[in-house]
């Protein structure tokens, strides 16, 4: 049986209204908008948060949002990005990656494909074979004619773009062409030398961007190894906000300190706000707190403050999780740990756990169509709803600081839960009655298969002992 002890906290300004999607969310989700704030524990943290976002800010705001699969697909991030850019101005699309070359699912905003042979590494790998950059993935090719291709489902809006391609630039780097829409920009040895010593190649381009392609070309005067970390689209001038989606499916908290190539890249991108939005892959399989979490958070905070001493570090919670017939009660302990670390390191804290219904709520989200059948990942409308809460939590916090300019803290007491595990018979009823298999068809990916069965890429990988997302037609996969 579940009991919630409600705790009383100080008066806060009224919650701002949500859009139509929020109004349509059923009461059974147990949403609690009292937690729609970014909590802070010192006056300094409040000042830094306000300075990062307020509309009179002279410089653009740069947001890094690290996380796992819920960030990689960009449903939540897209919702938050568009709403925040409507408030503060659009400084550009931000970073994109070629997920096709990394053999994984792409963002909802673009198709990313490749030609030729590419090797890849990802931040959830314990010993990645390539250096990792800020996006948590790296791809590399030594094949003449190999290509990275992007087709944007909605063109990147017309502007004076500064396009930066983060890639190695040394004696091993081959010549390559960049094709934006139908315009080709060659990067031969002379052109590449202009950017020698920098972690990127740069193009200024005016107009909308419908497609982008990088082609490796043959040249006797260049190398053969192209190592790629991501492409950044920002406006050449003006303020506004840029929101970088830096998700890697299956990544745990400690993945963020495995990004060896990130320091140089982060200095260029200069983050003002950094979300460390992990946890699911730390607690899901063991229902305990991982001993690596504290160390990873501390190292990440130290690193980002070395780049920007006033950076706002956002520590978040997981949502409620249900796995193999059991409620993952460690979500409560993870919430408490993130709040304690936020207080200890002068960060801000976003309590999505209590905001989204708290312990033992995810199955109701599934019943209402806001969570997938695996009771780990949300559906499209579930992630959209979460993105709306990110936006409104920012606006509510700014309003609170404006109305309480001398406030040194904004702390909302977390909910307390008493939970009794289901009986063995109840657990048995919740499990599938038999194993299920799927035979891979031509053109299918782990992502499309996981969506078909309401599962996840990571779950299918684990169930079948797959070390990568590479599959082939005729392969038999266990689905449950």
Predicted regions and their residues:
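Primarily a LysM-type cell-wall glycan-binding module
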Residues: 422-462, 467-479
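Active-site segments of SGNH/GDSL-like serine hydrolases
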Residues: 275-281, 302-335, 344, 351
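Oxyanion-hole/transition-state-stabilizing segment in secreted/luminal serine hydrolases
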Residues: 135-143, 257-292
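Serine-dependent acyl-ester chemistry module
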Residues: 238-242, 248-253, 280-291, 318-333
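Alpha-helical scaffolding within the catalytic cores
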Residues: 39-54, 255-267, 295-303, 332-336
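Catalytic His-Asp segment of secreted/periplasmic serine-dependent ester chemistry enzymes
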Residues: 321-420, 427
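Structural recognition of the beta-strand scaffold that forms the well-ordered cores
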Residues: 62-66, 73, 92-97, 242-247, ...
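N-terminal secretory targeting modules
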Residues: 1-4, 9, 17-66, 70-242, ...
């Amino acid at each position: 049986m579940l009991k919630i002890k409600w705790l009383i906290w100080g008066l806060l300004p009224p919650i701002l209204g949500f859009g139509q999607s929020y109004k349509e969310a059923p009461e059974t989700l147990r949403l609690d908008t009292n937690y729609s704030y970014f909590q802070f524990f010192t006056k300094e943290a409040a000042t830094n948060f306000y300075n990062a976002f307020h509309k009179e800010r002279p410089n653009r705001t740069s947001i890094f949002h690290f996380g796992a699969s819920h960030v990689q697909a960009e449903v939540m991030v897209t919702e938050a990005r568009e709403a925040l850019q409507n408030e503060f101005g659009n400084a550009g699309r931000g970073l994109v990656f070629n997920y096709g070359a990394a053999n994984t699912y792409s963002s909802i905003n673009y198709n990313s494909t490749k030609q030729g042979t590419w090797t890849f590494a990802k931040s959830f790998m314990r010993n990645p074979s390539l250096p990792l950059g800020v996006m948590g993935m790296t791809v590399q090719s030594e094949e003449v004619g190999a290509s990275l291709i992007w087709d944007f489902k909605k063109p990147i809006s017309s502007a004076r773009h500064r396009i930066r391609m983060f890639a190695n630039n040394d004696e091993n780097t081959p010549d390559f062409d960049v094709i934006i829409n139908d315009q080709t920009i060659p990067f031969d040895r002379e052109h590449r030398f202009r950017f020698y010593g920098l972690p990127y190649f740069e193009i200024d381009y005016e107009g909308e961007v419908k497609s982008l392609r990088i082609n490796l070309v043959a040249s006797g005067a260049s190398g053969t190894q192209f190592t790629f970390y991501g492409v950044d689209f920002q406006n050449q001038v003006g303020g506004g906000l840029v929101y970088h989606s830096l998700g890697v499916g299956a990544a745990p908290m400690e993945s963020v300190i495995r990004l060896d190539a990130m320091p140089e890249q982060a200095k260029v991108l200069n983050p003002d706000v950094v979300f460390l939005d992990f946890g699911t892959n730390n607690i899901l399989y063991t229902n305990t707190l991982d001993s690596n979490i504290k160390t990873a958070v501390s190292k990440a905070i130290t690193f980002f403050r070395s780049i920007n001493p006033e950076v706002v570090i956002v520590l978040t919670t997981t949502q409620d999780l249900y796995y193999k017939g059991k409620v993952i009660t460690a979500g409560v302990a993870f919430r408490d740990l993130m709040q304690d670390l936020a207080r200890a390191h002068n960060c801000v804290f976003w309590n999505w756990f209590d905001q989204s219904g708290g312990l033992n709520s995810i199955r109701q989200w599934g019943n209402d169509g806001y969570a997938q059948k695996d009771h780990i990942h949300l559906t499209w409308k579930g992630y959209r709803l979460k993105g709306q809460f990110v936006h409104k939590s920012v606006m509510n916090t700014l309003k609170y600081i404006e109305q309480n300019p001398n406030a040194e803290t904004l702390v909302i007491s977390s909910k307390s839960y008493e939970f009794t595990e289901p009986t063995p018979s109840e657990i048995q009823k919740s499990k599938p009655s038999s194993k299920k298999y799927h035979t891979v068809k031509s053109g299918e990916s782990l992502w499309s298969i996981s969506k078909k069965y309401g599962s996840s890429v990571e779950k299918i990988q684990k169930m079948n002992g797959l070390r990568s997302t590479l599959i082939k037609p005729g392969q038999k996969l266990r689905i449950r």
